[in-house]
Structures are given as structure tokens and as C-alpha cells.
């Protein structure tokens, strides 16, 4: 899962603290992005902002011009304020709090389903209209506005504001008199204010774990949006059966109240927010967020979260195919909320409470799939460094850790090797086969002459395949596109996933009633069989599709060449090895472009205009102040022999620094 940019030795001794921002973004605007885990992400994309000199802050304390907040950085790799240097207890407290918050808000989807039978009987509404409460909540969860807000105000304030507001709307549903014209808008608003838990949570995890440690934490976090809908029917079934439909809302309200104090005690993790607060304590004057920057930020937010995701669904085959794939299997899960009632209450005559227990089978499959993915990640994608591997140097460290990064290494040089994006599809291959097996299993065993344990066990391969496919797609998107474009990919996936999931429960009962259980589940299974070749197809032709992408790294380089041209004469001395990929900062490196295994792809700095004299390494003034901006800089990954290219990263004024 994780990745990193590590440095090579060079005469110029460059550092890797490169901040990536959109081309249209003003220098005062903070970047944004998201990772739903079911999703997406976002998280902070300013993790490796430029590193200021240790005495930069102290120089400003004596007066002078206010400095750009983005010029702030840690005092060094051992800075105790850096979340990467927190104790394991503090890291895991923050991780589990974020994960349980995700669990609480996703529980709200299926908790409501248990109230539908009583709403239909008591208030004389149609079953489809009653189920619309689930639809409206899922539509609310599809919004991703929380991620960019967290880049401005921080993770913790967004959590503390959004959850109580969502709980107030949940309380309104519980106190309503059953009129759907009241319940439906309240359910939608509850989902909207619950959505930041999903869109901001992944950024919280990436804020605190080093690149080669994030897999385990992210796995537990991504499990939450799946476990929430699976576990809540078990609780709500017994509660509504004994106390009435309103308890489907009270359970979520109680869960939200329990997690709120833990959020209040959770530390802020966003790098920019931590450094800004510390700057105020040190009496450092900071530039304010100008009105022009606010407008630019709003424009960028709308582009990243709404306009670009919709366009990518139309013009990007990678985004469209995998988003439809994930959305369909996720929608099947939500369709099971009604299908399981038909199977276990209709065929096996279980009570409301007992009929929720079969979801345990899917939950077991989710856990097995998560552990299996961790095994693939540690043994195949990013294996442990071999014995004798040199520890990281002080220049290579971004935290106090000195252990080598994980990952495949060149047998001769011991250098970390890049990972082709299609390599992450290996887990998707296992999942694509397991998913239809579980559906066929359920289809042909859910009958009265077969014990109920048989269809319950069918949930294990279904959950196993579901989580593996989601993990693979998440990583594939993250390594195919630049950081801000990844945020749009995940937003597109999140939107399509929850929109499709909101529709499936509306026709599931009719489908299972008229087609019968056998053929309804078989139909789902056959669609999944048709989708089995997807990971193999993209493994073979994915590289060509990436090179033709309108939003990938190749497109960015073509745009840079068109607008400014690349002048190799202005190339800055020094290279940066590209070794691993993260969900927020990645460069695509395809070993198929290398002429021999030992050849490496490196990150070289070039410029779209002549370099000012102040950037000359021999210039005395620059030697004193090494924080000069590189105007209109372009970061391009090229082969060592400069014969051909890999891909590029764009940066605007003041977004990248010579250090």
C-alpha cells in the first residue's frame, strides 16, 4: 500500500520535500484530496512540503514580513510535533478513533432498514417509499466536501462539527411522527454531515504513519465502512423487535455519543494546522488567506470534487470500468439487507432479530480478506528488506525512524525497485473469482431442504472478494494518477458507489420475490462472472491506457511541453530516486520502459523558463538563503540515460523550493 520518494546522493545534496499543487491553484491555497475507503481520501497532500532551514522561524520572530504558512516545516526528522514521531499508543488511538467514527456513520445506513416493516405497517406507507430513507442517507454519504474543508480547518474540527450535526438530524428522525416527508430530508442531511468521517479519515491515517507502515492501519480503517452495514442489522433487528422502530435511530445516536469524547481527546494530525498553531506560539507572523485565494480554493474544490470526477467517469476507461465494478458489488451488499429478509425470514422463518445474524458470514469474509491483503502487501508488493540492508541516512529520513523502507530491491545494488500500478491488481484477481462463487453458493443453497448454515457460509467468499477488489482498485487509482487527480478518481468512485447502492434496495425485494432466490442471486453471480476478466485485461493493456489518459502523468508532461517547453540546459544538478507509491504522492514508474533490470527511473528537476541567477548553486546569496521558489517548475521522471520519459509533476509559484 505505502510508498515514498527517497533520495540519491548527488553533488547538490537535494532534499525530497516537494509539495504538489494544482496548476491553477494560487500559492496561498492549501491542497485538498480524499480516500473513501470505501473509498477514498483524502488526506493531506502537503506531507513533504519544502523543508525550511532550522533557524528560519527564529529569524521571523524578531519582525519582518509575514511568511507564507506553507513555508513552515518541521524542525527536523526528529521533531516531536511531527505525527510520524508520535508514540505507537498515540498513533493507534488516533487510528482506531477514526475507524470507529467511520463504523458509526456507516451503521446509520442499515440500522434504518430494520425499521421499515414497522413503518409500512404502522403508518401505511409503501415498502419502496419506506426504503427511500436508506436511499437518501446513502446519497448524503456520497458527498465529499469534508476533505477540502479539513485542509483549511484541520481534521479534528471537521470531525467535531460534522458528527454532532449529523446526530441532531438522526434524533429528528427518531422523534418524527413517521411522516416520510419529514424522515427523508432528515435522513439525507444526516448522511451529508456524516460523510466527512469517510472522506477525511484516510487523510488522518496517512498523516501519522510512515510510508512503509501505513498498510496495517489503512486496512483496519477501510474495513470500517464495510463492517458498519454488516454489523448494524444484528443490533437493530433485536432492538426494533423488542422496543420499536425508533430504536434503529437511538442506537446510532448512542454510538455517536460514545465516540464523541474520544474525538475530542484526539490530537490534530494535519501538518499545516499543527505548524500554524506552533507558529502562533512562537510569535511568527503569517500571511492571511486572501479573498482571491479563497475564490481560487473554492474553484479548485468544485473542480476536484464535482466537475472533474464526472468528466473522468466519461473519458477515463480506468476510472469508469473499476468504478462501475466496485459500485456494483457494493450495491449487492446493500441489496442483501432486503434479500436476507426474504431468505431467512421467508424461507427459514427466523425472527426479526435472528434474521440479522447471517450477516456474520459476510463479516468473517471481510476480516479474512483484509488479513489476506496484508499478507500480499508484506510478502509480494513490499517485502521486508534483506539482511544487511543499510539503514536510512539522516537526509533520507522524514521521521525519527532509521530502519530501511520495505519493498523489492535490485539484487546487485540493493536499491528499491519501482512497482508497476498493474501489480496491485493481484488481489483483485483473487476477489473477482471469490465473489461469484459466494453468490452461486447462496443462490443454490438458500432453500428449505438445505440447512440455513449453507447460505450463511456463502457470505464468507462474498465478503472476502468484496474487500480485496476494493483494496486493489484503491491502490490502482492511487498509482495511475497524480495526487489531486487521485482525489477526483476516488470522488468519482465514491459518488457512483453510493448512488448505485442507494438504488438497489428499492427493487431487491421485488426481484427476489418474482425471480425467486435461486435466479435472483444467480443473475448477480453471472454479472460478476462477466467482470472476472477485468483485472487480467487491465494487467495486459493498462499501461497503454495510462499513457493515453487525459489526466495521467503523460498528459501532464505533454501539457508542460506545449505551454513552456522543456529545456534540458536548465536542469538542476541532482536526482531523486523514485521507489514507492502512496495514495497521495506518486509517480508512475513502469519497469517495462527500462532496458535492463538494474536501470532506475529518477526524478529530475527541469524548468519551463530560464533559471534566475539566484538559483545558481555557486551563488553566495543562494547559499545563505536556500528557500528561493522555483518559478513555474516542472518535475519530470526520466530515465537515467535521458532516452525517453516516465511522467511529470506540476507545481506553481512558491509550491516547490530549492533546499
UniProtKB/Swiss-Prot annotation:
Modified residues (Phosphoserine): 633, 646
Pfam family, one: MFS_1
TM region positions: 100-120, 129-149, 158-178, 188-208, 216-236, 247-267, 317-337, 356-376, 424-444, 457-477, 487-509, 519-539
Further comment: Present with 21400 molecules/cell in log phase SD medium.
Parts of the chain on the Extracellular side: 121-128, 179-187, 237-246, 338-355, 445-456, 510-518
Cytoplasmic topological segments: 1-99, 150-157, 209-215, 268-316, 377-423, 478-486, 540-659
Role summary: Cell membrane polyamine/proton antiporter, involved in the detoxification of excess polyamines in the cytoplasm. Recognizes spermidine, spermine and the antimalarial drug quinidine, but not quinine, chloroquine and mefloquine.
The name this protein goes by in its record: Polyamine transporter 4
Similarity comment text for this entry: Belongs to the major facilitator superfamily. DHA1 family. Polyamines/proton antiporter (TC 2.A.1.2.16) subfamily.
Gene coding for it: TPO4
GO molecular function: antiporter activity; spermidine transmembrane transporter activity; spermine transmembrane transporter activity
SUPFAM superfamilies: MFS general substrate transporter
UniProt biased composition (Polar residues): 1-20, 28-45, 622-631
Subcellular localization, as worded in the UniProt entry: Cell membrane
Region (Disordered): 1-81, 387-408, 587-631
Predominant place of localization: membrane
Keywords from the named record: Antiport, Cell membrane, Membrane, Phosphoprotein, Transmembrane, Transmembrane helix, Transport
Membrane topology: Multi-pass membrane protein
Positions where Phosphothreonine occurs in the chain: 589, 606, 608
Entry's induction text: By transcription factor HAA1 in response to acetaldehyde accumulation.
GO cellular component: cell periphery; fungal-type vacuole membrane; plasma membrane
Native organism: Saccharomyces cerevisiae (strain ATCC 204508 / S288c) (Baker's yeast)
Chain intervals with Basic and acidic residues compositional bias: 587-602
GO biological process, one term: transmembrane transport
Amino acid at each position: 500500500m505505502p510508498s515514498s520518494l527517497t533520495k540519491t546522493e548527488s553533488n547538490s545534496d537535494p532534499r525530497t520535500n516537494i509539495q504538489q499543487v494544482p496548476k491553477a491553484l494560487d500559492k496561498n491555497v492549501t491542497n485538498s484530496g480524499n480516500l473513501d475507503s470505501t473509498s477514498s481520501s483524502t488526506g493531506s497532500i502537503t506531507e513533504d512540503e519544502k523543508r525550511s532551514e532550522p533557524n528560519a522561524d527564529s529569524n521571523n520572530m524578531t519582525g519582518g514580513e509575514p511568511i507564507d504558512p506553507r513555508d513552515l516545516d518541521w524542525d527536523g526528522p526528529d521533531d516531536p510535533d511531527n505525527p510520524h514521531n508520535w508514540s505507537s499508543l498515540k498513533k493507534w488511538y488516533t487510528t482506531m478513533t477514526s475507524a470507529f467514527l467511520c463504523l458509526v456513520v456507516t451503521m446509520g445506513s442499515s440500522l434504518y432498514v430494520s425499521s421499515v416493516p414497522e413503518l409500512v405497517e404502522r403508518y401505511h406507507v409503501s415498502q419502496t417509499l419506506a426504503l427511500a430513507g436508506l436511499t437518501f442517507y446513502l446519497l448524503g454519504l456520497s458527498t465529499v466536501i469534508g476533505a477540502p474543508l479539513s485542509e483549511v480547518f484541520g481534521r479534528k474540527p471537521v470531525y467535531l462539527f460534522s458528527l454532532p450535526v449529523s446526530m441532531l438530524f438522526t434524533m429528528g428522525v427518531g422523534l418524527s411522527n413517521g411522516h416520510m416527508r419529514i424522515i427523508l430530508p432528515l435522513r439525507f442531511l444526516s448522511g451529508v454531515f456524516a460523510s466527512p468521517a469517510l472522506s477525511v479519515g484516510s487523510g488522518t491515517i496517512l498523516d501519522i504513519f510512515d510510508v512503509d507502515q501505513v498498510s496495517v492501519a489503512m486496512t483496519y480503517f477501510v474495513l470500517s465502512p464495510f463492517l458498519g452495514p454488516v454489523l448494524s442489522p444484528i443490533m437493530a433487528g433485536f432492538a426494533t423487535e423488542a422496543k420499536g422502530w425508533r430504536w434503529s435511530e437511538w442506537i446510532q445516536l448512542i454510538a455517536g455519543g460514545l465516540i464523541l469524547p474520544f474525538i475530542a481527546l484526539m490530537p490534530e494530525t494535519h501538518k499545516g494546522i499543527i505548524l500554524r498553531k506552533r507558529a502562533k506560539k512562537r510569535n511568527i507572523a503569517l500571511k492571511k488567506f486572501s479573498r482571491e485565494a479563497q475564490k481560487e480554493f473554492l474553484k479548485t474544490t468544485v473542480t476536484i470534487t464535482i466537475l472533474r470526477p464526472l468528466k473522468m467517469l466519461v473519458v477515463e476507461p480506468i476510472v469508469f470500468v473499476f468504478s462501475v465494478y466496485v459500485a456494483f458489488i457494493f450495491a449487492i451488499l446493500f441489496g442483501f439487507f432486503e434479500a436476507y429478509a426474504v431468505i431467512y425470514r421467508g424461507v427459514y422463518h427466523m425472527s426479526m432479530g435472528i434474521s440479522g445474524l447471517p450477516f456474520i458470514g459476510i463479516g468473517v469474509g471481510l476480516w479474512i480478506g483484509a488479513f489476506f491483503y496484508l499478507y500480499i502487501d508484506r510478502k509480494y508488493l513490499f517485502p521486508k528488506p534483506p539482511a544487511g540492508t543499510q539503514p536510512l541516512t539522516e537526509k533520507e529520513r522524514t521521521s525519527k525512524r532509521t530502519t530501511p523502507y520495505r519493498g523489492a530491491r535490485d539484487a546487485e545494488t540493493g536499491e528499491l525497485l519501482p512497482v508497476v500500478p498493474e501489480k496491485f491488481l493481484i488481489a483483485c484477481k483473487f476477489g473477482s473469482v471469490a465473489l461469484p462463487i459466494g453468490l452461486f453458493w447462496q443462490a443454490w443453497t438458500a432453500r428449505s431442504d438445505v440447512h440455513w448454515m449453507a447460505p450463511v457460509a456463502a457470505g464468507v467468499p462474498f465478503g472476502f472478494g468484496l474487500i480485496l477488489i476494493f483494496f486493489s482498485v484503491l491502490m490502482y487509482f492511487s498509482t495511475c494518477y497524480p495526487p489531486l487527480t487521485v482525489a477526483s478518481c476516488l470522488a468519482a468512485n465514491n459518488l457512483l458507489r453510493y448512488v448505485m447502492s442507494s438504488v438497489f434496495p428499492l427493487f431487491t425485494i421485488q426481484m427476489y420475490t418474482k425471480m425467486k432466490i435461486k435466479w435472483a442471486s444467480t443473475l448477480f453471480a453471472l454479472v460478476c462472472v462477466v467482470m472476472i476478466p477485468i483485472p487480467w485485461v487491465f494487467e495486459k493493456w493498462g499501461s497503454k491506457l495510462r499513457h493515453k489518459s487525459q489526466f495521467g502523468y503523460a498528459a501532464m508532461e505533454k501539457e508542460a511541453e506545449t505551454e513552456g517547453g522543456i529545456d534540458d540546459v536548465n536542469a538542476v544538478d541532482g536526482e531523486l530516486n523514485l521507489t514507492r507509491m502512496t495514495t497521495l504522492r506518486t509517480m508512475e514508474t513502469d519497469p517495462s520502459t527500462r532496458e535492463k533490470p538494474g536501470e532506475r527511473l529518477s526524478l529530475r528537476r527541469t524548468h519551463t523558463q530560464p533559471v534566475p541567477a539566484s538559483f545558481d548553486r555557486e551563488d553566495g546569496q543562494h547559499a545563505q538563503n536556500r528557500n528561493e521558489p522555483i518559478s513555474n517548475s516542472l518535475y519530470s521522471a526520466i530515465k537515467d540515460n535521458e532516452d525517453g520519459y516516465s511522467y511529470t509533476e506540476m507545481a506553481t509559484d512558491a509550491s516547490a523550493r530549492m533546499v
